[in-house]
């Protein structure tokens, strides 16, 4: 097997898809089931109560930046420096001490002074215990970052997702019990979070406990700190960009406005969930191809287009069916005004995803020292806009300020990355998907206005109006096709998929043909597996003696891997043709 094929076998599209799907499934199910708690929160908590919860969680996120010390990044960076088990165990041990002793000191001091701190944040007394419970949850959550990061570094997505499912199984019922049965309100939510984090942390200890040396490697610790601490400043200015608007809303509008904005933020999270799943698997996937820069650039460009298409499609669906989304996930009428803010925040997350895509070039060229500067510029713009417009316009101004900040951040990141590692991103296709999304959302709004749709109407009327708008959602793929979004290679693969679907009704004939080609692998009593059918089609279309040999070996795992290589070859060839100018 060639070196190229060996590399592909260890880190090809199959690995990216598998890891993204598994990480994403765990995260998305967790977020989905957590979203199911939103009707509970909006029924048992007032907007003001939800605002208190939002302020507690945002403040905890700020504290997390200081407590983490950037060691999540350092862990990933130094773990691969020494490929021996002993060397990696030293890294794990250092991370363990940073995740336990240092946070215990910092969080303990904050807990002592929290009555005074919370009095300033909330403009009144009586909130200290809420924040102290959140600090306890932060301690165990930060500690559990060690095993969860280790699962990802060692490509154990199933184990990672098992803990995500366990979080759901514990946190959801416990929160429902405390909020509904014991009427504990915000306190019940925070207790449920803390108990869940403690339980998961305790359960994860056996997965790495034997690898701890309990002796700090001082020299290694100095290097890790030198690498990690600069990231703290970046994280702080990034916090300002993403979350500081809550403090402005609290200052000028109060807890109720913070609660509504927090609701809108929760409703806008589907795109963020997709980005989180993708960013967990994407870096280790494309960095494995750096030995061939031209190939690496093509693969990054094409895969980022598909990722952005997913994000834009999710934003489009959110915009089209916003009234239904609000009515399904919020209970009280006092929460139903968050639609416009939700859509704007979803757009800001799409821009955040674009920033993440553009970051590749700076990472490859090791030019990340400029990231704190450009993040500070974007954050300064965000703060300035918040100061100028939040006092008058409230949460919609906060949302648009976030959009402006992320737009500037993405633009600056693109400029830095392209200067040092030029990637031919598919700008024409990105613009086309943006135009298609905008026109689709505009059409949905026009239909809503024409039919008199109102989010405050009886639920049956809302459902009826959403049915009127359902065909509008089809505009998005139709516009993509009309605008020439698809490349020739993609149209060819779609046509091939359509041919396969048309052949499926004739299953006996297909099975017989498979039996003739594959021998005992396909009979009426033992029909071909879906993977075998893919291999047969790949062999027929790829051509050549080597491919026919692969099809003949279709029974085992080796063939599955080789067939995946053929599939990836087709993808790479299509990407290369497109980048060579066959399409725009």
PLM features per residue range, with description:
Residues 1-16, 186-187, 202-242, 281, ...:
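Interhelical loop/hinge segments that connect adjacent transmembrane helices in multipass membrane
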Residues 2-3, 72-75, 149-153, 157, ...:
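C-terminal transmembrane helix end/exit motif
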Residues 19-34, 167, 189-204, 208, ...:
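Transmembrane helical elements of multi-pass membrane transporters/channels
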Residues 80-97, 260-376, 497:
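Specific pore-lining/lateral-gate transmembrane helices of multi-pass inner-membrane transport
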Residues 114-134, 255, 319-350, 456-460:
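Interfacial segments at transmembrane-helix termini and the short loops linking adjacent helices
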């Amino acid at each position: 097997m060639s070196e190229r094929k060996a590399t592909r076998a260890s880190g090809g599209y199959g690995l990216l898809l598998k890891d993204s799907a598994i990480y994403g499934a765990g995260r998305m199910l967790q977020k989905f089931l957590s979203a199911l708690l939103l009707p509970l929160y909006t029924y048992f908590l007032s907007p003001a109560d939800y605002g208190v919860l939002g302020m507690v969680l945002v403040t905890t996120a700020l504290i997390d930046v200081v407590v983490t010390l950037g060691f999540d990044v350092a862990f990933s960076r130094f773990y691969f420096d020494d490929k021996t088990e002993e060397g990696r165990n030293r890294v794990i041990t250092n991370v363990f001490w940073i995740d336990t002793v240092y946070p215990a000191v910092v969080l303990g001091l904050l807990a002592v002074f929290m009555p005074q701190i919370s009095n300033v944040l909330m403009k009144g007394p009586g909130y200290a215990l809420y924040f102290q419970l959140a600090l306890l949850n932060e301690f165990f959550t930060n500690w559990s970052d060690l095993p969860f990061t280790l699962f990802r570094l060692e490509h154990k997505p199933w184990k990672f997702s098992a803990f995500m499912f366990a979080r759901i199984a514990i946190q959801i019922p416990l929160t429902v019990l405390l909020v509904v049965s014991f009427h504990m309100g915000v306190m019940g939510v925070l207790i449920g979070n803390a108990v869940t984090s403690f339980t998961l942390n305790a359960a994860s200890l056996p997965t790495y406990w034997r690898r701890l040396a309990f002796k700090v490697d001082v020299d290694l610790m100095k290097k890790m700190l030198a690498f990690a601490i600069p990231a703290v400043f970046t994280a702080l200015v990034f916090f300002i960009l993403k979350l500081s608007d809550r403090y402005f809303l609290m200052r000028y509008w109060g807890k109720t406005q913070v609660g509504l904005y927090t609701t809108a933020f929760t409703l806008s999270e589907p795109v963020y969930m997709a980005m989180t799943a993708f960013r967990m698997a994407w870096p280790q996937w494309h960095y494995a191809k750096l030995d061939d820069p031209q190939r690496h650039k093509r693969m990054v460009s094409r895969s980022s287009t598909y990722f952005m298409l997913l994000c834009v499609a999710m934003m489009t669906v959110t915009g089209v069916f916003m009234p239904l989304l609000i009515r399904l996930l919020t209970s009280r009428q006092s929460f139903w005004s968050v639609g416009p803010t939700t859509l704007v925040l979803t757009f800001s997350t799409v821009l955040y995803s674009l920033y993440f895509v553009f970051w590749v070039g700076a990472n490859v060229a090791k030019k990340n020292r400029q990231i704190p500067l450009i993040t500070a510029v974007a954050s300064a713009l965000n703060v300035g806009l918040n100061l100028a417009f939040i006092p008058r316009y409230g949460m919609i101004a906060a949302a648009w300020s976030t959009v402006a900040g992320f737009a500037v951040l993405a633009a600056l990141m693109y400029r830095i990355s392209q200067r040092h590692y030029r990637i031919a991103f598919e700008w024409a296709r990105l613009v086309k998907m943006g135009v298609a999304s905008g026109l689709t959302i505009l059409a949905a709004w026009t239909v809503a206005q024409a039919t008199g749709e109102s989010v405050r109407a009886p639920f049956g009327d809302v459902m009826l109006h959403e049915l009127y708008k359902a065909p509008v959602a089809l505009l998005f793929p139709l516009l993509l096709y009309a605008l020439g979004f698809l490349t020739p290679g993609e149209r060819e693969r779609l046509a091939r998929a359509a041919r396969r679907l048309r052949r499926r009704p004739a299953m006996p004939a297909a099975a017989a043909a498979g039996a003739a080609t594959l021998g005992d692998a396909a009979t009426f009593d033992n029909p071909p597996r879906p993977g075998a059918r893919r291999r047969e089609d790949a062999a027929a279309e790829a051509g050549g003696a080597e491919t026919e040999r692969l099809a003949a070996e279709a029974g085992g795992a080796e063939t599955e891997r080789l067939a995946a290589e053929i599939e990836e070859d087709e993808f790479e060839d299509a990407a290369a043709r497109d980048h060579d100018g066959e399409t725009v």
